[in-house]
């Protein structure tokens, strides 16, 4: 039986870009990732898919990169040849993943091992959990509803394409939906449909396998885990963001220049994002909190540094759909270039409640790490003492309880 994942390229580009930095700069780092489902309830307990998940992981850990896949990675200008040589030998090791269930029929997943292994499991496992869960709920009516919603999106993109002023900065969206997709075949169908409807708007996909297959641009730079790791590396905690950005610059020399801002919140990020970084990075990515407030803060920061914000890119990727993206573009288009990464709403809009699942880095080298998101519900750690200390160091207030 062919597994749900049948290519190691079937993941997000930023896994490769982050893995390359880890391999080159801190390859001995040890990490722990933990799974969490944020849904209050599910149609059936996730514990029910445990056996199938175990089998899928066994199959995943048999996969190797093919010569054709390695050739594609080598063609990306920011991927270095020694990294591709490493990937030729690469194979995920099953022993680093533990799967269990608890007395409430919840699924527990722990990935613990070298970061150069553990980091690469995340997207695969989330995509497998999603597909196994929704497979049991599939009916012809579900596919029909998904298709109806997809055609409505395609029609809306055609309208937007017709309304765009060619003299204004373009409205560009990308698929960021691998981790929470309905299944790979559906993700491909969605991208093909939207590309055909509005080729000038659909910029690419975060999924490397589909970017290669469809001949479109793979999109991505860094995730929270990259910055969080520096909370436990050999730098003062207060300086972890600067160290992470410096490390990125050292690796990519101006390429892949979009920085993620919400590991300890936008205000704390901007205190570290000085003139040097602001000139060097092409722009910023929003992933939590009010996107309008966030973008206005970014604009004020660039103004203060006397940088023309119209030369910079704001990328939005937090719970978007086409309408929210278009509204944000209208608001910011005169001040910034914009880009929009749309995830679940593209790849799993079938009428069911999607799974809100994550697999997050919680420890690095035996030390807790955390994210103080601009959205309180996205804060995740297994150590409340460290979280309080992080708040204190970066002067981030406790979120108000409703």
From Swiss-Prot:
Residues carrying Phosphohistidine: 224
EC number from the UniProt entry: 6.3.4.21
Reaction equations catalysed: nicotinate + 5-phospho-alpha-D-ribose 1-diphosphate + ATP + H2O = nicotinate beta-D-ribonucleotide + ADP + phosphate + diphosphate
Gene: pncB
Domain of life of the native organism: Bacteria
InterPro entries found in the cross-reference section: N/Namide_PRibTrfase, NAPRTase_N, Nic_PRibTrfase, Nic_PRibTrfase-Fam, Nicotinate_pribotase-like_C
One Pfam assignment: NAPRTase
Biological processes, Gene Ontology terms: NAD biosynthetic process via the salvage pathway
Gene3D superfamilies: nicotinate phosphoribosyltransferase (3.20.140.10)
A GO molecular-function descriptor: nicotinate phosphoribosyltransferase activity
Post-translational modification: Transiently phosphorylated on a His residue during the reaction cycle. Phosphorylation strongly increases the affinity for substrates and increases the rate of nicotinate D-ribonucleotide production. Dephosphorylation regenerates the low-affinity form of the enzyme, leading to product release.
Name under which the protein is recorded: Nicotinate phosphoribosyltransferase
GO cellular component: cytosol
HAMAP family: NAPRTase
Function recorded in the entry: Catalyzes the synthesis of beta-nicotinate D-ribonucleotide from nicotinate and 5-phospho-D-ribose 1-phosphate at the expense of ATP.
Pathway membership, UniProt: Cofactor biosynthesis; NAD(+) biosynthesis; nicotinate D-ribonucleotide from nicotinate: step 1/1
Keywords: Ligase, Phosphoprotein, Pyridine nucleotide biosynthesis
């Amino acid at each position: 039986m062919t597994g749900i994942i049948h290519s190691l390229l079937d993941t997000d580009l930023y896994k490769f870009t982050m893995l390359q930095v880890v391999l080159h700069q801190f390859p001995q780092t040890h990490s722990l990732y933990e799974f969490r489902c944020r849904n209050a309830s599910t149609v059936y307990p996730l514990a029910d898919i445990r056996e199938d998940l175990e089998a899928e992981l066994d199959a995943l850990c048999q996969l190797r990169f093919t010569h054709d896949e390695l050739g594609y990675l080598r063609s990306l200008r920011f991927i270095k040849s020694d990294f591709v040589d490493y990937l030729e030998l690469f194979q995920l090791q099953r022993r680093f993943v533990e799967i269990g269930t608890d007395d409430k029929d919840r699924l527990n997943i722990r990935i613990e091992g070298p970061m150069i292994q553990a980091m690469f499991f995340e997207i695969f496992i989330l995509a497998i959990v999603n597909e196994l869960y929704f497979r049991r709920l599939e009916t012809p009516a579900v596919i029909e509803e998904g298709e109806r919603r997809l055609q409505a999106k395609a029609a809306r993109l055609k309208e937007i394409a017709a309304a765009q002023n060619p003299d204004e900065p373009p409205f560009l969206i990308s698929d960021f939906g691998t981790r929470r997709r309905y299944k790979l075949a559906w993700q491909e169908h969605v991208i093909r449909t939207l590309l055909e409807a509005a080729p000038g708007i659909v910029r690419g996909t975060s999924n490397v396998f589909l970017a290669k297959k469809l001949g479109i641009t793979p999109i991505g730079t860094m995730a929270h885990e990259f910055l969080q790791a520096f909370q436990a590396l050999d730098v003062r905690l207060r300086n972890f963001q600067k160290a992470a950005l410096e490390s990125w610059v050292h690796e990519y020399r101006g390429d892949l220049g979009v920085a993620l801002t919400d590991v300890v919140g936008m205000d704390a990020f901007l205190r570290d994002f000085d003139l040097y970084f602001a000139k060097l990075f092409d722009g910023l990515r929003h992933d939590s909190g009010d996107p309008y407030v966030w973008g206005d803060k970014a604009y004020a920061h660039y103004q203060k540094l006397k940088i023309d914000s119209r030369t910079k890119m704001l990328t939005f990727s937090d719970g978007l759909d086409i309408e929210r993206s278009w509204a944000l573009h209208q608001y910011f288009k005169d001040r910034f270039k914009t880009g929009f990464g749309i995830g679940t709403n593209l790849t799993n809009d079938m009428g069911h409640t999607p799974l809100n699942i994550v697999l997050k880095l919680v420890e690095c080298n035996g030390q807790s790490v955390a994210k103080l998101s601009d959205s309180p519900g996205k804060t995740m750690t297994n150590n409340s003492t460290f979280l309080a200390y992080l708040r204190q160091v970066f002067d981030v207030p406790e979120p108000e309880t409703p």
